[in-house]
Every structure is written in C-alpha cells, then in structure tokens.
Amino acid sequence: MSKQIQIPDIGSDEVTVTEVMVNVGDTISVDQSIINVEGDKASMEVPAPEAGVVKEILVKVGDKVSTGTPMLVLEAAGAAPAADEPTAPVADAPTAPVVATAPTASAIVEVNVPDIGGDEVNVTEIMVAVGDTITEEQSLITVEGDKASMEVPAPFGGVVKEILVKSGDKVSTGSLIMRFEVLGAAPAESASAPASTSAPQTAAPATTAQAPQAAAPDTTAQAPQAAAPDTTAQAAQSNNNVSGLSQEQVEASTGYAHATPVIRRLAREFGVNLDKVKGTGRKGRIVKEDIEAYVKTAVKAYESGATAQATGNGVANGAGLGLLPWPKVDFSKFGEIEEVELSRINKISGANLHRNWVIIPHVTHFDKADITDLEAFRKEQNALREKQKLGVKITPVVFIMKAVAKALEAYPRFNSSITEDAQRLILKKYINIGVAVDTPNGLVVPVFKNVNKKGIIELSRELMEVSKKAREGKLTASDMQGGCFTISSLGGIGTTHFAPIVNAPEVAILGVSKSSMEPVWNGKEFAPRLILPMSLSFDHRVIDGADGARFISYLGSVLADLRRLVM
C-alpha cells in the first residue's frame, strides 16, 4: 500500500530543499533522514515517519516547501506494489522532473530554469561552455538564493549551442538559460523544451520539459517581456505608457542602467526611471527589491507632501526623502583601495535594520544595575552543581531573562506589537524572549518560549542546548519565531553602553554591556559593587519616555534583589 509522506510541522515559513538523501527504490527505516531543508539562517534534516520503500520522490533540490508539502510516496515494507502504478513520473506531476524521450529529428531546444520556487536567485557559476556535449542531469549552472545554493541540471542531453545567462544574473522559474542542439529531437518551433515522458513524438510542440512553461508555450513571442538575453531591444522599448510618479521619476533613462529585461519591464509598469535607482545586486545590478524600495519611498514622500530635492540614486541616496544625494567619491584618488561585495546576510539584515531604524522612532534609556549579590549567588550555585556533576552552568543571561519576564508582566505595554496601520496595539498574553547569539555564520536570535513559567535551571539547560544548535547551524524556523522582546548581550566582549535597534514587530530591546566593579556610596562609605550597564531602546509610538524609565528602573531593582522574582 502506497502512502504519501508530507513535510512535518517546521513552522509557517517556506524553506528550500538543499539535498534529497534517498532514491527511488531505496528501503528506508523510521527516522532515517529523507531530505535536507534550509530556511533563513537555519537548516534541518527531515526524517521518515515510517519505514518502507521509496516509490516516488515529489521534490527536488531547489524546491520551496512548507509544512504539509508532499515530498515522496512510500510503499509500506512487505506491501504488494499496485498493478497500475506508473513506472515514470507523469507529465502533470507538479514537482517531478520531466525528461525528454525518443526524439525524432535534430533540433535546437531551449533549456529553462526548473521550478525553484517563487523567488529570484543569483547565477553564481556557469559550469559548461558553448560546444560542450552534455548528458542528462549534468549540472549546467549554480544559483544562489537566500542562504541556499543549488546546481541546475540538464533536463536532457545535447550540445550547448548558446549560453544566455552569465554570473550575476537574476533568474527565476522558467527563465531561459541555454539552447541545446539535441540529436534526434523533434523541431522546436518556439521556446518549447523537450517533450514529457508521455507521447514524446506527438506532444512535443505542446508539452514542455518544465511545468512553468506549460502555461505559456509560445515564449518566443513573449521574449521582450521575459528574462531573455536581448537586453538591447528590451532597453529600447518606449516608456510612453508610464504614469503615477513625478516627471523627474518617469522621464526616459538617458544612460545605461544595469538591469535585466524583466526588471526594465517592472520599472516601466511602476513608471520608474532606472537612472534614479541604485542597484544593490551583483556589480550594481538593479533587482526587484530596489524598484520596490524606490517606489515605496516615493509614494511615502508624495503622501506626506514632501518633494524630492535630490537627483541621487534610489533610497540609499535619499531619493524621495528630500535629502541631499549621497556623495560620489573616487576614493582611489587618495590611495589604494579594495572593493568587496557585501555578504548576503549583510544585505538582508542591513535592509531589515535600516527599515526598523527609519520607520520606528527610537528612544534609548541608559541605566545601571547592581548585580553584586546576583553574581555571588550565581557562582555559589555553579560551584554546587559542578560538585554534583549535573552538567548545567548558570550564566548571567538567564537571570536577565527572568528579570525581563518579570518586568514585562509589570509593564505589559512592552509586551506588544503595533498594527500595520499604527492605529491599534496587540497585547500579548505570553512571554517569549529572544536572545541574540553570535555564531560563525552570523548573528541569530533564537526565541525562548514562556520564560515566565520556567525556572533558572530549566532555562540554563535550554540556553546551553539552543546555543549549541545555533553554533552548529541546526536552528529551525520555529526556533526563531514568536518573540516578544529581545536581549542583546555584549557583556562577554566589552563596551559600557550601546543603542540597540528594535527588532520589529517587537517594540523594545535590551542591550547589556560588560559589568565592572565601581565604588558606590552606601550612606557611610564608598563600597565596591559589581555594576551592569543596560541600554533600553523602545518604539516611542507605543511607549512614553516615562514608562521607559520606569521599566528599566524596575528591571534594575529586580536584578539587584533576586527575591523580587518570587513576589
């Protein structure tokens, strides 16, 4: 009896399949890893929920999947195979690769990007050259998306006649990448790819090798609107149909803009002059996000009555914000320079941080907490547990988490999120706290659930386990969702104070710096006390300055006297 196996609960986000770890015909056992998936800064292996024989694999490397997505068909061990079970993937299988068969004549056939999800990805490597003889499933190009890279295989064999992409190009599902001369293939009158496994000789003109093309077989006629190589013809098309923005923003481009035809079409639809947009892609290429950010900024400026006084390039230059343009400086005139590409995580986190900093009106309060007694108690408990060989080490962060949870109960406005229209407040009845963890792969913020209901030892053990998972890159999407408040601790590195940026949609964040001994007047004399510097940043739309002061003062009092945690 065959059974369809689905992706288990991995959170609400889509993830990318980075490796298929079994083959059709394999006999697998319970909990054997089937596929590897990777989300935003986290990867995991998906185990088999039951044993059996793999009859069909429904996903491939590069597919976007989420909870409930079918990934393979499993036949229970010892079950008789179904008599009418097909021996090859049928043409309408949504995710099964389709392979060309039984060609009848030599022809030029187009090769398109298979189904890799809805996002655009970067071409990072061309793995073949014109004239190469390619076999089926041989890797053609390497593409890289958000924290995941994959190789795009050849759907059929042939000789490479033309390569239509280069390193740095943005491609997506259905993008034309190469043309093959296929010996014995039926002539392709348009952009039709190789025929599917069913009826190869009669279905060739109408059935393509890849699902994205099935809805549009005549892609030759649509080439000016698709991601085709003819950028010259694409760039020369008229801009007379644009409307909606200022004359300066919609005027025809007078210079060369580094953008693909699909981006040029998007710019025309929005009425954007590409000369005004700064590209953030590889080698300054303009990508979809640049267009969206430019339009969003221009619309905000229009709605607020502001006028762009600058003619700089895009959001980074203050376009639409009434700011002076970003200065263009030839730094090489002053000495030797080196220009390096920002990492993908730098670009992604930078965009989020910039959005949060620009949209959220930040206020930061600074204060100090006396943690002399807390630190003495912590060291005493660690020494006791070391003797008992319990394998649990209590860190200052755990006490700070408990103190923050107590403060969130006392000041529930800090445990909220503002709606998108900034008209209502969502008060949360749970307390989940995110803790920033520095890892070799970058900064991640795992979320600890129901901190107010857990004890110091339980939280310490959980912190150790989660930190290990973070360093090994094994955090799942659900591990980093649902936060109410974030703690960013630089105590192990240094600094006295810093101003952390609120992690939207949260409304506050606590920055913790390095503690040090300071003389404190106790009414009779100066006594050495261990002092912890704290920085509280909050959204001023939600929290007043007075409430911010009350929150951080209350937090300091709890850290100074742990007895308040049980009250």
Curated annotation (Swiss-Prot):
InterPro entries tied to this protein: 2-oxoA_DH_lipoyl-BS, 2-oxoacid_DH_actylTfrase, 2-oxoacid_DH_E2_comp, AcTrfase_Pyrv_DH_cplx, Biotin_lipoyl, CAT-like_dom_sf, E3-bd_dom_sf, PSBD
CDD domains reported for this sequence: lipoyl_domain
The organism's taxonomic lineage, starting at the top: Bacteria, Pseudomonadati, Pseudomonadota, Gammaproteobacteria, Pasteurellales
Name this protein carries in UniProt: Dihydrolipoyllysine-residue acetyltransferase component of pyruvate dehydrogenase complex
Gene Ontology CC: one annotated term: cytoplasm
Residues of the signal peptide: none
Domain Peripheral subunit-binding (PSBD) per the UniProt entry, residue ranges: 258-295
Subunit details: Forms a 24-polypeptide structural core with octahedral symmetry.
Region Disordered, annotated ranges: 192-249
GO MF annotation list: acetyltransferase activity; dihydrolipoyllysine-residue acetyltransferase activity; lipoic acid binding
Assigned protein family: Belongs to the 2-oxoacid dehydrogenase family.
Pfam families: 2-oxoacid_dh, Biotin_lipoyl, E3_binding
Skewed-composition ranges (Low complexity): 192-238
Modified residues (N6-lipoyllysine): K41, K147
Gene3D superfamilies attached to this UniProt entry: 2.40.50.100, Chloramphenicol acetyltransferase-like domain, E3-binding domain
Entry's cofactor comment: Binds 2 lipoyl cofactors covalently.
Keyword terms, alphabetized: Acyltransferase, Lipoyl, Repeat, Transferase
Gene designation: aceF
Residues the record marks as active site: C484, H540, D544
Catalysed reaction, written as an equation: N(6)-[(R)-dihydrolipoyl]-L-lysyl-[protein] + acetyl-CoA = N(6)-[(R)-S(8)-acetyldihydrolipoyl]-L-lysyl-[protein] + CoA
PROSITE patterns linked: BIOTINYL_LIPOYL, LIPOYL, PSBD
EC number: 2.3.1.12
Needed cofactors: (R)-lipoate
Biased composition (Polar residues): 239-249
Enzyme class name: transferase
